[in-house]
């Protein structure tokens, strides 16, 4: 009988890998930014704490389920072949137990210590990623990351709901930013990992439509992202400090995309992918800093 009780130290690390901690950290960071932007002053710290814990637990559960569903795909890809699910060192029953424990705990925390709205929105995000994206979209359409990107874009709305028990237009603007950011971020990865995805049999855009078309889409999305990131300023959510950061960070993003479009190399694609992660973290950091500058100077 399989159990996740008292695992070996090496197994603990394998469990952690299944939760994709780096991706989870960025998602939770964006959720926390949403929490602090939801109110003019300091948010209820109890809701911030338990909202963060609950969202992290459900995100980790969703990623673990993703690894279970994609274990055969992961085994064919160099980037993911070392995951415990791909190597067979962690059984499906163990992953289901882990995900059930994390997800169940997360839902209880959000429902009882935050609010039901956040719990249901986070659960819907879990289903959107673990089922709709992983099972239905990813293996069937090159637009998988576009359509399925909504679930990955939800953290700011989840954070906002944690504190305000509502999801107003301002929260959806933050969701829109991540939604538009997602395709160029993942397509940059898919470009320099094309053969990996081909071996896995996944219909990623560089495989179905070629490198040139993918690079064109990345460039177009980078322009759209630049425009969308100006919305917080024009909607009076943030001030000039944020606007300056958005223009500089967005300009660098567009420059990377233009260079990649004009002349492809794996290194240029890799640089864009890495910068896109830094970009999102810095952009959301600028949202928070500008917000607090406004609060303190009011």
Swiss-Prot record:
Q: What does this protein do?
A: Converts heme B (protoheme IX) to heme O by substitution of the vinyl group on carbon 2 of heme B porphyrin ring with a hydroxyethyl farnesyl side group.
Which terms in the GO cellular component ontology are assigned?
plasma membrane
PROSITE patterns listed in its UniProt record: UBIA (PS00943)
- Please name the Pfam families in this protein's record: UbiA
Q: Which GO terms describe its biological process?
A: heme O biosynthetic process
UniProt protein name: Protoheme IX farnesyltransferase
Gene name of the encoded protein = ctaB
**Where do transmembrane segments lie in this chain?**
23-43, 49-69, 95-115, 117-137, 144-164, 171-191, 234-254, 276-296
The misc remark on file is: Carbon 2 of the heme B porphyrin ring is defined according to the Fischer nomenclature.
Superkingdom of this entry's organism?
Answer: Bacteria
| Major location category of this protein | membrane
List keywords of the entry alphabetically. Answer: Cell inner membrane, Cell membrane, Heme biosynthesis, Membrane, Transferase, Transmembrane, Transmembrane helix
Recorded metabolic or biological pathway in which this protein acts: Porphyrin-containing compound metabolism; heme O biosynthesis; heme O from protoheme: step 1/1
